Amino acid sequence: MKLIILIVLSILISIVISGSVQSKITTTRGISNVYSKNDINNIKQFISSKYNGNTKLYGESLKDTFYGVGVLTRIGETNIEATKDICKQTKEQLKQNKFTDIELVFNGVTILSELKCLQGESSSSLGNEQQLQDLLKNKLENGSLLEKTQAINIYFTLSSAKAIDSKTVSIIDPLLIQAVNSMVSLMDEDGTFKSVSTDDEGNLQNTAAAYFALARLSHRLKSNEVDKLVAKVVNKVDTVLASADETTDSLYFNDLSTTSSLLHGLLSLASVNDKVADVISNKQINQISEYLLRQKNVESLSDAYHLIVALKRCQKNSISQPISLALVKSIYSPSGLNDIRVRVTDIFDQPIEASIVINKVVSSKNPRSTPILSGKEMKFQSSDNSFVADLSNENLKLGSYNFEFKVQPVDTDSYKSITNIQIITITGAVTVNDMKLSYAPKSDQLGSPKTTNEVQFGQKLPLIEIPSNNIARIFFRIASEAQPYQAQQVGIRFYSPAREAVVPATYSADAYSYTFTNKDACKILGCQSGNYQLDLIIGDQSITPLQWNFGEINLKFNQSTIPTNRYPEQLPISHNFRVAEKRPPQSISSLFTLLVLSPIAIFVIGLLFVGTNLGRFPTGMGFIYTIGFLGCISATGLLIVNYWLHSTMDVTLKNLALLMIPLVFFGHKSMSYYSNLSSSNIKKD
């Protein structure tokens, strides 16, 4: 018996262990997009366009400059425009402020630190040292949560740059542990942080700021007391994560700035407390990355800053760093199957060392069918940092196939393995020839070689910027076995993370084309400036459907962006009711009413002429039966009158059905009584 119990326990333990291990090694599909060099160049240009030569700042204030400088330093821009002027203007504003506005001081000190303008400086060069001490001391002791975190960040930034004197250090250091206690006391039951103790509830922005500040304090102070308080905060992280908005492939908190700040704070906490890694999963990091990559087209310095900060934290963190697998080409001819290529990169499109295996290949039409091939290892090509597989001998016919790639990174501490499915189309039925993208100020200049870009079938054009005053045309031919082919459906798809539109191509003289102006593009894309991928979509019942990503264009619109709306305003709904049938004349209606009421009238008139004889009214049980019968008949009459006045047929029939039970009973008893009475009278006679 003991042996059986031990066997059962061992089986249960093995199931639990295998389940937990399985949950740890579960792979994801990776991210579907990356922040490429083109995206970095675009955001550089956006930041540069916000520089104000008069104020020597980015945007309108020191806060905007904090955002602009933060973006440029994080994307590796070393030669920032007018660095000396920005530092000079920042120092002047700090001196004018006299250390009274904690937010302005935080922005200014951070700008100087990131531009390396604090090296060899002291805090006295920014203003009165005593005023700085008073500001930090006051905010650490009596400030709101955000003011405490800003004071902590100012202090650590100046300390790192050795730009603060020993007297200030001796005053502020003892207040830091007190600040930790004060901040943790502001944590609500749901894990969020209040601004002050009198607030009814906390919010996520406060929570993000508290996470980052507590992580810095834990790292700097090396105190067991602080670590215990941080652990108390970490125990509520799962509750905070549960408040996220989640879709199939993305996860976010309210908006971009909140998502970025909270991610930054959570990953900072993870660097000082290992339990955070048990709460945030690899899948959630990938979902947040997907959300961030959809926010590429920023429209403010604030959005640009929060986007880059969050992307950088995704790229480098102690939990999981997302990776992407992308096809170099998605369309192959049967003769080109010896060169199937993919690239594996991080979120900033940087190559990653890995090994790749094609797990299986199945038909896209029947994904559950038996794999055509499996376990095919791909070889690394250092020339372009891609992985190659030769499938020329695998008997792949024309059609679309689901390729399942298993990516195992070399650096398993930083990256997790992914399983990614990509669709590769093998087509020989139709080909696209003479694909050209041209643009010019006038339509009769569209054929100029200088502004015409050609691309071979299956390849992709580099990014092309189309001026807003130009006309653009996409021209191509579709052929089958070297003969012109007119497909049933041919469209051009414009898409970006924010917008998507498909327009039909026009067929004429054995060729397809689509011509558009900046105004046309603005109308179909909601005037959303940015980069748009171009896909050619061909559909026909007699060929394999084809979707080819042949290029990328940059469109800039002068009009303001039209916001998207899932529920656009529609025209009011008007109902056409059936015309009522013509009613009969009033005389006919009156005659019908008289006919219905005539039996009652005859009964009343008859009583007046004949009279009533109550002497023969029954006694005993006959009396009860007769009264019940007459009562039921009266109730039936009243029910009919009620129906005429305001009741409905459904209600009337239900009540009539109930009334028929006592009516039949009393009627039967009454008739039986009178029948027996008549029989007895006949016998007497």
UniProtKB/Swiss-Prot annotation:
Subcellular location: Endoplasmic reticulum membrane
Membrane-spanning ranges: 591-611, 621-641, 647-667
Membrane topology: Multi-pass membrane protein
Keyword Endoplasmic reticulum: yes
UniProt keyword annotations, A-Z: Endoplasmic reticulum, Glycoprotein, Membrane, Signal, Transmembrane, Transmembrane helix
Signal peptide: 1-18
Pfam families (alphabetical): Ribophorin_II (PF05817), Ribophorin_II_2nd (PF23861), Ribophorin_II_3rd (PF23860), Ribophorin_II_C (PF25147)
InterPro entries, sorted: Ribophorin_II_2nd, Ribophorin_II_3rd, Ribophorin_II_C, Ribophorin_II_N, Swp1
Job of this protein: Subunit of the oligosaccharyl transferase (OST) complex that catalyzes the initial transfer of a defined glycan (Glc(3)Man(9)GlcNAc(2) in eukaryotes) from the lipid carrier dolichol-pyrophosphate to an asparagine residue within an Asn-X-Ser/Thr consensus motif in nascent polypeptide chains, the first step in protein N-glycosylation. N-glycosylation occurs cotranslationally and the complex associates with the Sec61 complex at the channel-forming translocon complex that mediates protein translocation across the endoplasmic reticulum (ER). All subunits are required for a maximal enzyme activity.
Quaternary structure annotation from Swiss-Prot or TrEMBL: Component of the oligosaccharyltransferase (OST) complex.
Protein name as annotated: Dolichyl-diphosphooligosaccharide--protein glycosyltransferase subunit swp1
